[in-house]
Structure formats: structure tokens, C-alpha cells
A protein has these predicted regions:
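Bacterial N-terminal signal peptides
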Residues: 8-18
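Bacterial N-terminal signal peptides that target proteins for export
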Residues: 1-9
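Metal-dependent phosphoester/phosphodiester hydrolase catalytic core
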Residues: 21-349
Length: 349
């Protein structure tokens, strides 16, 4: 009898200790013919995505990737060759085990020269602080994470993350491994999982997901910060050849979003005022000007982690770089480019 009981307890323990399906999933940007799916596992495994148009399982397609320790077990799958304006249903299998719930997304419609531009909804936010057991003493800053489910319930077409999307702590910003550990903990948070699969996500950064508070281009670990950002945010592009950073552009419907990097090339805030003192840098602003002139969008939304024009801001803002700010303002007035809007993060409500 004792042997039977031991066997029974062993069987129960084996069931209890069997690893559950464990992976973090986030939707990247979706265009008319593809969507980026980001997946992170807890070990090196094979990831398989089965995909088909919603309601048409006969047109099933398969995409595969492998997660590796050197990439923090994160993989980006480009689900390409899709049809415009189509809803898709997918299942992710990790090491042969399918996710408990299927995912869904839609490609952008092909509307040009055919119909009016489609209506769409954009959500945006910044400063996502999640409390940790080794945070400094005092009242915790993080909370009210029910906002993520509220956003997910609205099912926006696009979510713009405006920086400080994670907060590196002192033990973390000194290494790629530390930065990745913070990203991994936040991305796996239960509070974020529904939103991560509810819409397309595109991000920029600000100081706290770049390095220390108020960090700038002198931060010696900025290369590691950029590598971690690319690993966890599968934007369509990151910077330009020869000009590193997280800046780029995405288009949704008939609106262009210009994503700026206010950290990688930034001069220190306390640098003496001089013509060369810059927040964005000549190369990045040169690209922005060309892109604005080239854009045919009725609205052109310029996005950055810090405020552009609010002079009442006593903290970090573009007005601390008056030469660069004035040069951009003068250029915009001279060019008379219509429909330019500015969107920034870094403000806490």
C-alpha cells in the first residue's frame, strides 16, 4: 500500500511540476501584406505559427522560428505574403505545445485610388513603471494597470509607446543582460498580456528605457540599450544606415507617423548653450525634413519621448536646446508643410 501511495504521490507531483505553456507574445506592426509577431520563450525551442484567414482554415500557412539564448529567447516572425484588408487567426505552438487561445489580427486595407481612407483608432501612452521588490524606499510609483485591459477592450488599430516603456534600475542599465532582464519581466507581466495581442505595437524610447534618469548620448551603454530595444520592439526599422537609433516612420491608413529618437544623439542637458547643442542631431533632423517634404499624408504626426514646444515644462524638453528647436521651427514655418502635429510622452498624470 505504501508503495502504491508513493507512486500515486509521484504521479501527482509530476503533473503539478510539468511545465505549463509559457511564452510572451506581442503583435508588431501590420501593413497591407504582412504582420510582425514577437515571441519570447523561457528556453531554446522551436516556435511554429499556424495562420489562416478568419473563417477559412483550408488556406492555412505555417511560419517557423527558433529562440536562442543569445537573443534572450526572443524571436521575431515576419508573417508575410498576406492579403490586404483581411482578418487572420493564428495559433502559436512552442516546442509542440499550442497556446491555449488563438490570436487574431488584421492587415491594413488597400484603399488608395479605390475608396476613401479608412477610419482607424490609435492609442498611445508612456511611462510604464512596474514595481519591484528591490525598488528604493518610499511609496511605489507603479499601479492602475487595469488601463491596459481598458485599452485592449477598445481594440485600437495601433498602439504607440512613447518612451519610458520600461524603467531600468541601477543594477540593470550597466549591462545588456540587465536591460534584457527588465524587458523580459515587464513583457511577461500578466497585466500586459491581453493588450500585447489586441493591436499592433510600435515604440520609441525616452531616458528610462535608454539608461539612467535624464541620460544622453554620452551614455557608454547606449549600444547595448539599442540592441535590447531592437530585441523587444520589432519596429519596421531602427534608424538609418550609418545613423543608429530608434527613429523611423510608419503609415496607418492615410496618416504618417514620424518616430524620433531623443536620446542616442542627445547632448547633455547641462551642456553649455552653443549652436552644436542638440537633442535629435543633424542627421536625424535632416532625415525628418526630407520625410516631411516627401509625405503626401494629410496629417503628419511627429512623435518623441519628450515635449516639443511647452516652455512651461521645468524639466527635460526641447526648449533646453534652443538653437536646434528654433532651427526646426523656422524651417517648418518657411516650408509651410500642412498637417504637422506633434505628440510626446514623459508627462505623468
Amino acid at each position: 500500500m505504501r508503495s502504491a501511495l508513493r507512486l500515486a504521490f509521484a504521479a501527482v507531483a509530476a503533473v503539478a511540476l510539468a511545465p505549463a505553456w509559457a511564452a510572451s507574445i506581442m503583435h508588431g506592426f501590420a501593413d497591407m501584406s504582412s504582420m510582425t509577431l514577437w515571441v519570447q520563450t523561457d528556453r531554446a525551442v522551436r516556435v511554429v505559427v499556424d495562420l489562416h484567414p478568419d473563417g477559412d482554415p483550408a488556406r492555412r500557412r505555417r511560419f517557423e522560428a527558433a529562440t536562442r539564448a543569445e537573443d534572450d529567447f526572443a524571436a521575431t516572425l515576419r508573417l508575410a505574403g498576406l492579403e490586404p484588408g483581411t482578418r487572420y487567426r493564428y495559433t502559436v505552438a512552442v516546442d509542440g505545445k499550442p497556446a491555449p487561445d488563438p490570436g487574431r489580427f488584421a492587415t491594413q486595407p488597400l484603399w488608395q485610388y479605390r475608396t476613401d481612407p479608412p477610419e482607424f483608432a490609435v492609442a498611445f501612452g508612456s511611462c510604464m513603471y512596474m514595481n519591484d521588490r528591490f525598488d528604493r524606499p518610499g511609496a511605489p510609483w507603479g499601479g492602475d494597470f487595469q488601463i491596459f485591459d481598458a485599452i485592449a477592450a477598445r481594440a485600437p488599430d495601433l498602439m504607440l509607446w512613447l518612451g519610458d516603456n520600461v524603467y531600468f534600475r541601477e543594477p540593470e542599465w550597466t549591462s545588456l543582460e540587465g536591460m534584457s532582464a527588465r524587458y523580459r519581466a515587464v513583457r511577461a507581466a500578466p497585466e500586459l498580456r491581453r493588450l500585447a495581442r489586441a493591436t499592433s505595437h510600435v515604440a520609441i524610447w525616452d531616458d528610462h528605457d535608454f539608461g539612467p534618469n535624464d541620460s544622453d548620448g554620452s551614455f557608454v551603454m547606449k549600444g547595448a540599450a539599442l540592441e535590447a530595444f531592437k530585441r523587444y520592439w520589432p519596429n519596421p526599422s531602427h534608424g538609418l544606415p550609418g545613423v543608429p537609433g530608434v527613429f523611423g516612420m510608419v503609415t496607418w491608413g492615410d496618416i504618417d507617423f514620424f518616430l524620433l529618437d531623443n536620446r542616442f544623439h542627445r547632448f547633455p542637458n547641462r551642456y553649455p548653450q552653443a549652436p552644436e547643442k542638440a537633442m535629435f542631431g543633424r542627421a536625424q533632423l535632416g532625415w525628418l525634413k526630407q520625410a516631411l517634404v516627401s509625405s503626401r499624408a494629410p496629417f503628419k504626426v511627429v512623435v518623441a519621448g519628450g515635449q516639443f514646444w511647452n516652455r512651461a515644462n521645468r524639466y527635460e524638453a526641447f526648449h533646453n536646446f534652443p538653437a536646434e528647436q528654433k532651427a526646426l521651427a523656422d524651417w517648418l514655418l518657411e516650408q509651410k508643410i500642412p498637417g504637422v502635429l506633434f505628440l510626446s510622452g514623459d508627462r505623468h498624470l
